[in-house]
Amino acid sequence: MTNIRKTHPLAKIINDSFVDLPAPSNISAWWNFGSLLGICLILQILTGLFLAMHYTSDTATAFSSVTHICRDVNYGWVIRYMHANGASMFFICLFLHVGRGLYYGSYMFPETWNIGIVLLFAVMATAFMGYVLPWGQMSFWGATVITNLLSAIPYVGTSLVEWIWGGFSVDKATLTRFFAFHFILPFIISALAAVHLLFLHETGSNNPSGIPSDSDKIPFHPYYTIKDALGALLLILALMTLVLFSPDLLGDPDNYIPANPLNTPPHIKPEWYFLFAYAILRSIPNKLGGVLALALSILVLAIIPLLHTSKQRGMMFRPLSQCLFWLLTADLLTLTWIGGQPVEHPFIIIGQLASILYFTILLILMPAVSIVENNLLKW
């Protein structure tokens, strides 16, 4: 009798994706983040579902309902903080996953890479709208500032902003629709993730050496299932340490003050995972220019495959490109730091220099250094 796992229409899909999938024999722990992101997504959907059972998306009661979840619901505080800090873990995994793709040339699978960029935008949109829901000071003013950026679009900007708000300011209609979008987007993300995997499995995984691994494949199970299980264990350990020891470490204290349209917080800033983009936005004095730079800070990833000039796929054997990659990493950390600082000297000029460096590395230096490395190969 043939094994049901290989014949049953549903079991066959799971089998071909997670059991009998041929995988390169040399992929490192940097290839764990796909499964970790899947775990993060499932965790966020589950905790979010339980939060939605108690949350009310009304300006009068939203803040109180979150307080009620934390104080009165059985283990509500655990669910709430797992959801809030789960978003941070999600973004840590996302940034590491994208960084791995850049380092090892995984962007040479264009469909997989481009769907990944769409996924990144979708997760960022979801996180932004989720941050608005508790209706604290930073929720309200963050929503006001970020949605207002769309007014920089010529001709249709103002109408577009009022259309998104559902009125002339961020109010009840805005909160209700943000809750609706925040609820539906994770399911769209799940569907996109399935397509992301579909395209990945068309080509098979890349590997650290960047050379084809067809001659040396091993089954996904048990080798990589056990490896992913270890990664999952470490992820849950990190998340629960954060949740149980310092749940507010990555949050903003201003969000414990109920939203007040008449009182602006001294420093409006988003969650830490948006600070690098926020720093790029603020480094340009012109509003439309800032918005374009903000969009390009992520969209620049889409043209990375077109700028690949190296004869080698990954950076494993390219020390000059490696130096640039780690300079880019340091630059992003600098931007993240600047995004959380007030707009004053010397932070303004540091932010502007870091923003210029970010685009210079990706668009000019990396392709140029790759050409130099190609010529060095001839020696």
Curated annotation (Swiss-Prot):
Component of the ubiquinol-cytochrome c reductase complex (complex III or cytochrome b-c1 complex) that is part of the mitochondrial respiratory chain. The b-c1 complex mediates electron transfer from ubiquinol to cytochrome c. Contributes to the generation of a proton gradient across the mitochondrial membrane that is then used for ATP synthesis. GO terms for molecular function: metal ion binding; ubiquinol-cytochrome-c reductase activity. Heme 1 (or BL or b562) is low-potential and absorbs at about 562 nm, and heme 2 (or BH or b566) is high-potential and absorbs at about 566 nm. It is a multi-pass membrane protein. The keyword Metal-binding applies. This is Cytochrome b. PROSITE patterns: CYTB_CTER (PS51003), CYTB_NTER (PS51002). Heme b b562 binds at residues 83, 182. It comes from Lontra canadensis. Belongs to the cytochrome b family. GO terms for cellular component: mitochondrial inner membrane; respiratory chain complex III. Binds 2 heme b groups non-covalently. Keywords: Electron transport, Heme, Iron, Membrane, Metal-binding, Mitochondrion, Mitochondrion inner membrane, Respiratory chain, Transmembrane, Transmembrane helix, Transport, Ubiquinone. Heme b b566 binds at residues 97, 196. Its cofactor is heme b. The cytochrome bc1 complex contains 11 subunits: 3 respiratory subunits (MT-CYB, CYC1 and UQCRFS1), 2 core proteins (UQCRC1 and UQCRC2) and 6 low-molecular weight proteins (UQCRH/QCR6, UQCRB/QCR7, UQCRQ/QCR8, UQCR10/QCR9, UQCR11/QCR10 and a cleavage product of UQCRFS1). This cytochrome bc1 complex then forms a dimer. It is found in: Mitochondrion inner membrane.
